[in-house]
Design a protein with these regions (language model features):
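Short solvent-exposed coil/turn linkers within tandem alpha-helical repeat scaffolds
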Residues: 54-62, 88-97, 123-135, 156-169, ...
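Residue-level recognition of tetratricopeptide repeat
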Residues: 35, 70, 105, 141, ...
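Hydrophobic/aromatic side-chain positions at a characteristic register within alpha-helices
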Residues: 38-39, 73, 108, 144, ...
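"A position-specific structural signal for the A-helix of alpha-solenoid helical repeats
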Residues: 32, 67, 102, 138, ...
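Residue-level detector of the short coil/turn that links helix A to helix B
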Residues: 41-42, 76, 111, 147, ...
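N-terminal leader/linker segments that initiate helical-solenoid repeat arrays
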Residues: 20-70, 74-76, 83, 98, ...
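Catalytic glycan-binding domains that act on GlcNAc-containing polysaccharides
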Residues: 328, 379-384, 389-398, 402-404, ...
């Protein structure tokens, strides 16, 4: 649940009376339909329903307009929400300030902080008690965004006076940040409970800044480790030297953080890099946040300024490789090869670049690395690449030599496992079933990472040899020992067992302590304090190992329902460590918090809802804001280009900022999945592979001998990530069926 969702839950209660007394007109029916869609987790559909009704009705009553604005807020179309409400003659009198609160939220999202604060204040004046307190917190946040610290402090004080005991520590923290009287501010910060206490040092610095003591504020920010805030404040007061040290120190120390990403913008705008170390620090931060091209330019400038350190050369090699400049990458890695610390990495990466170049020296470089650095974690990969390269050329005798050395030296390594399967696949193509079986048995004996895969294929080979009873015994043993894994479920079908059914006992209700905690999180979300709610969730995750099984299950169930899917699943895995045979744990590891929305979108496009939820679980773990390193967004993890293309095909209005609206993302994801299923003749395995890797490579893979057999098709997917993804999606579909579909006669 987000800040906007929290506000609209709050506003909904205020709107009930007005809605109940509205006339039973066509717009009213549309509003009811929209509310039903919203409650089913389909806010975009709700907004579209009301938009269509509005186009048919020249005169709309206040209830319909407010419901439309709320729907637009849920759909993150904030400008539309605002335009529906601004200037309405009934705005200030509607449902005890409910319309004012919706307008204020839209304005806040649009960056109109002063207008938002004024409208929150007007809404607050029309109510009492906890509703007034929640609106006061939102008003304070808006005043803070507008830079009006005194008004923000007054609003937070009013919120505390109206009574929000569940979140008082967090409101105290906000109030202290904007209080000019440091004595009062420091009293507010005294004895804060965790996790709010972790923010006290930063709040103390902000209080000093509110009081005008910038020198003390700078020191407090330094002590709190808030380098970005320190740099901004130092810049504002003309201390560019301190700001520079803070910015570039942050980017060098923690380039992957959000603060480092923000530091890039500050540095480029006010303090561009001057020295090679600054350029390298900037490049590292750029690289981690989608700026590889700019990072490469900064590293090249550092090299031209005389930076010849191995660390910079290795970074340059990485960036050149990303850009396809393989010759430049090879030279950079070669120059770093003599370094005592990074030399091995440089030699290995140079060898990989030579492979990409098709250089005749690639084999010698890989084998030389594997022989010179046998204890390096990359040595098995080097040997695998040698075998893989020769195998792709059809030289299976040469491939077997290197794969054999890999298996002998690193028998339990993942690459050894992959080598066994490459050799086994070739043996099967050559009709050497006994050789393939020996390789599969070796994987089992070694306890390799693909041992369940090997056992499944041993069953298939046993069946091909005519030993039906032996094959059945192998598969039944696999069913017992890997009951919820992909190959255990696959073996289940081979022996004609009924579909897996997991009749889990009801999940426990929350204990008083857990219920109190959820009350605090819900109140934080209603108040618009999303970051504080996230801090509370992180605190629960940090102490999960100390909790009992029922607490973990209750927390996981509640968090999944509130949109914290990844956190819920993490708690589920923690519960599995404590009680591995408790079937209730699976409902936390494989939750279905948005079931109605998934089923509705699947039905609209004629796809299996179990397949769609299996993909969502694998792609985003039900995190509507999920962002992948490749730029995929939302529940169904769509790339912006894919989302836009799919929307165009559906004649759906789409803007990039809407991509994480939950049901719009699901809508486009379901449409994309249906298109892939149609393209590949209904083959779920191929469609799942294409969802992960794209349609073009899957088309090539389907043209290979043996691809008609789904088992062989999956095993021969050359991308390890995609191979694992397809298995996981198919396993997920079986488990969601086992957990959530009632048995039928």
């Amino acid at each position: 649940m987000t800040r906007t969702a929290g506000l609209l839950l709050f506003v909904a209660a205020a709107s009930l009376q007005s809605t109940a007394t509205a006339q039973q007109t066509s717009p009213y029916v549309a509003a009811q339909r929209a509310e039903s869609l919203r409650l089913a987790g389909r806010p975009w559909h709700a907004a579209e329903t009301l938009l269509a009704a509005a186009a048919r009705e020249p005169r709309l009553n206040a209830t319909f307009v407010v419901e439309g604005a709320k729907a637009e807020l849920y759909a993150r179309r904030y400008d539309r929400a605002r335009s529906l409400l601004v200037g309405q003659p009934w705005l200030e009198d509607y449902a005890d300030g409910a319309a004012l609160a919706v307008l204020a939220e839209a304005e806040g999202r649009l960056g109109l902080a002063t207008q938002a604060a004024a409208h929150y204040a007007a809404a607050r004046a029309r109510v009492r008690g906890s509703r007034a307190a929640l609106l006061a917190v939102r008003e304070g946040l808006a005043w803070e965004a507008a830079g009006a610290r005194d008004s923000a402090a007054a609003a937070y004080g009013a919120a505390r006076a109206a009574g929000l005991p569940a979140i008082d520590a967090w409101v105290r923290l906000r109030q202290a940040r904007v209080t000019r009287d440091t004595a009062v501010a420091f009293r507010l910060l005294a004895d804060l409970p965790a996790p709010a206490a972790r923010e006290a040092a930063s709040a103390r610095a902000q209080a000093l800044l509110s009081a005008g003591d910038s020198v003390a504020a700078l020191e407090a920010l330094a002590q709190a480790g808030r380098s970005l805030d320190l740099a901004r404040l130092a810049l504002a007061h003309g201390d560019s030297s301190r700001a520079r040290d803070a910015l570039y120190g942050l980017m060098a120390r923690a380039p992957e953080t959000d603060d480092a990403a923000a530091a890039v913008g500050v540095a480029l705008a006010a303090l561009p890099p001057r020295t090679p170390p600054e350029r390298v620090a900037l490049a590292r931060a750029m690289k981690g946040h989608g700026g590889a091209a700019d990072a490469r330019l900064e590293v090249e400038r550092a090299l031209r300024q005389g930076d010849s350190s191995a660390a910079t050369l290795v970074l340059a090699g990485e960036l050149f490789t990303t850009a396809g400049r393989y010759r430049d990458a090879e030279r950079a890695y070669r120059s770093a090869a003599a370094d005592p610390v990074l030399g091995a990495l440089a030699i290995y990466r140079r060898a990989r670049v030579l492979v990409r170049l098709g250089d005749a020296g690639a084999s010698e470089a890989l084998s030389g690395f594997a022989q010179s650095f046998p204890s390096d974690t990359a040595a098995p990969t080097a040997l695998y690449m040698l075998g893989d390269m020769l195998g792709d050329r059809g030289d299976w005798a040469g491939a077997a030599r290197w794969f054999g050395e890999l298996i002998a030296r690193y028998p339990a390594d993942l690459r050894a496992s992959l080598a066994r399967f490459r050799l086994a696949a070739q043996a099967l193509r050559d009709g050497l079933r006994d050789s393939a079986a020996a390789l599969f048995r070796a994987e089992v004996v070694a306890g390799g990472p693909q041992r369940t895969t090997a056992r499944f294929w041993l069953g298939k080979l046993t069946l091909l040899a005519g030993d039906t009873a032996g094959a059945r015994a192998t598969w039944l043993a696999l069913v017992r020992e890997d009951s919820i894994g992909y190959y255990g479920l696959r073996a289940r079908r081979e022996v004609d067992l009924p579909p897996l059914r997991i009749a889990a006992a009801p999940l426990p209700g929350p204990s008083p302590a857990v219920a109190t905690w959820f009350g605090r999180v819900d109140t934080l979300l209603l108040a618009g304090l999303d970051t504080a709610a996230q801090a509370e969730v992180r605190a629960v995750l940090a102490r999960a190992a100390q909790q009992d099984i029922d607490a973990l299950l209750a927390w996981g169930d509640g968090l999944a329902a509130r949109g914290f899917g990844p956190a819920a699943v993490r708690l589920g895995w923690q519960a599995a460590l404590k009680s591995p045979n408790d079937s209730r744990v699976l409902r936390i590891i494989f939750p279905w918090p948005n079931r109605r929305a998934v089923e509705a979108e699947a039905a609209e496009f004629g796809v299996d809802p179990l397949l769609l939820v299996a993909i969502v679980r694998q792609e985003s773990v039900f995190d509507a804001q999920a962002l992948s390193p490749a730029g995929a967004r939302g529940l169904a993890q769509l790339l912006p280009g894919t989302a836009a293309l799919t929307a165009r095909g559906l004649d759906v209005t789409f803007y990039p900022e809407w991509i994480t609206v939950p049901d719009l993302n699901l809508h486009l994801g379901a449409a994309h999945l249906q298109e892939l299923l149609q393209r590949f003749g209904g083959r779920v395995d191929a469609a799942a592979a294409a969802y992960n890797a794209g349609a073009a490579p899957v088309k090539r893979w389907l043209e290979r001998p043996g691809a008609d057999d789904p088992d062989e098709f999956i095993e021969l997917i050359p991308y390890q990530e995609t191979r694992g993804y397809v298995r996981a999606v198919l396993r997920n579909r079986e488990l969601y069926h086992a957990l959530y579909v009632a048995p039928t006669n």
